[in-house]
Amino acid sequence: MLRFFLRYTYKPARILASRLPDLRNDLQKSNLYISAEGIIFRSMLFMLISIPFIVVAAYFLAQAGLGIFVIALPVAVVAPLMLMLNLPKISASSRSSALENELPYVVGYITVLAGGGISPFITIKRLSKADAIFPAAAREARRILLDIEIFGMDAISALEKVTKTNPNKLFADFIGGYVAVLKTGGDALSYLESKLKDIFSYTEGKVKRGSEFIGTMAEAYIIVTVVMGISLTILWSTQNLLGGISNGGVGGTVGLGGTQTLNASLIIMFSVLFVPVISLIFIIVIGSAQTREPFSFDLPFYVFLACLPAVAVCYFVPFGLPQYTQLGIGLAIASTPAAILQWRYVKHRKSVESKLANFLRDISEVRKTGLAPEKTIEQLAGRSYGGLSEHIKRISSQLSWGTPMRTVLQNFGASVKSWLTRAMAFLLLEVVDVGGGSTKMFTDLADFTEKNAQLQVERRSMVRPYIMIPYIGAVMVVMTTAMMLYFINPPGLSEAGVPALAPGSIVEKATNILLICSFFQAWVMGFVAGKMGEESAADGFKHATFLVVICIITVYVSFYFISGIKF
């Protein structure tokens, strides 16, 4: 069947490909290894496969009395074609983003090696083997080597091709300028150093723009979740607790037999479905504006999945506590182990990264005395470098035993869980292994590390204030719920002979429903706080736990001062 379909779609695919010249350019800039005709053929195949499903969907919609939605089904027929035609652009954007995150380190790597007299070809060859540290840059280097070693292009021509086929404009401009300097015989090292400064300036501007964007997203998130949640809580409480007055009752929605019922579907759907989906969208959008490392620490997520059944146990098993309190405790129990694991990882990573620039600067200064790199590290083993000290002492011990520098630094890179530290260890290894550990190369590496450390500190300080926004929002939701319940059924009405606006049983059920939704909503908002303020959703486990605990304390403190509400 596939051959039959290919026979009748090959010519239309070729005609369509000839009328879409940008498609070939997009494919060259993407990570897709397929021709323009091939991707059009696949899109037509997916269109053909989707037609029976769309016909069945149209039949069921018509039977359900939703025939108006059948009008939109033809759009679903062409959706596979539009998706496949835009797939190269999506892939090119992903390729560009991954390379841009590594670009300062890659340019710093090329600059350091160029300062030691290493040729561009050797630099590219060594970079192509750095998958463990710079996966995106290593793929780009292998593309260049493929043109040189397989297709017989010279190094300059292969680099010129990069300027036309690479989707990242910053990297393409860097390579284009580098090629121009090599062609004219200019000072390549001076160009690399100036370009490195430009890239740091660009990255600094990107960090500032990203922080402003995160601020805008934080305001939008508060409006969508907190303001809308408070408004919905007030409307729901008014409808369900006071609605019975218009029906001759004293509150609630009058059901069969004159009984009062609560319709909680809307408020539950908002808190359990709408808020998590919106939060996930905000996390993805915020992540697109943040600098991402090639590798991440995913163990907290697996620990959280293992602890997730605790939520069901605490919620459904009666422990003599209000149901919303049991849910809050269950959510806190589920996220606490992951929060502790992530906290320990972040603490260790920061303790190592904070002293890395000082260590490399001390190496460059001691190296000026003429000591060998191995002896230089041994001399620095007695100094205090925070969390980095234990690793330096281990490196010094291994070097004193005669272990080769390459093996020692590779073991060091494997023992730390910080990608930044691994990248710097890789650069240090290249300085010693390729450049012989010259004083200038150590100085260049130290300068680069200090600039990068300053940029990291500035980036964290600019986004950290946004952590408090979800905290304020979660407390507002809980406080609004408590005050709403107080105003609906204030104390002292019975003593004054005034009937209560809503029966105690209805108020108790409404309290349970509203606080269950508020606790879950606050817990979800903690992950957004982690992504906004610490650039990692895994840090959200800590904030989610804190928010649930704060909400529980807020509820009990509020109910202590607001009499007349059962909890």
Show where each model-derived region lies.
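Helix-boundary and N-terminal cytosolic regulatory elements
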Residues: 13-64, 536
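Membrane-helix interface and helix-disruption motif detector
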Residues: 61-67, 256-265, 293-295, 316-325
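Juxtamembrane/interface alpha-helical elements of multi-pass membrane proteins
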Residues: 69-163, 173, 309-413, 423-430, ...
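Transmembrane helix-loop junctions at the membrane interface of multipass transporters and ion channels
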Residues: 237-245, 288-291, 310-325, 529-531, ...
